[in-house]
């Protein structure tokens, strides 16, 4: 049996209309959708894409909003183990994440762990919030020779 593939899918800043066509295609085709849960049942990313994943098997991925690196690493390790077990069954897994998976995303830690174990994984970009805000304000983030610097809050 062939191994499945993991997709880290950016679902944008919150508006379902900003989910890319590629993200929608990957989500509709995935066997399992991995859903980050920050606690208290908060699954914002799932609410954004619910129309694309209706009836899909969901894998709840506890990702508490804490600064304890050892606790977080343990969570990411367990999530990676669960995902790899699904990949070993030949199933495809789409891990949804707000914005873009390469910009301050919880997903990237799981991505690295899965890749380190020899599995195939692909990043599916999404609209990052800072781009959505600029569009909402009808303004440019930078032009010509200007530089753009993104600094965490």
Region spans (language model):
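Class I S-adenosyl-L-methionine
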Residues: 1-16, 21-24, 28-120
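Class I SAM-dependent methyltransferase SAM-binding "motif I" and its flanking Rossmann-like core
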Residues: 102-153
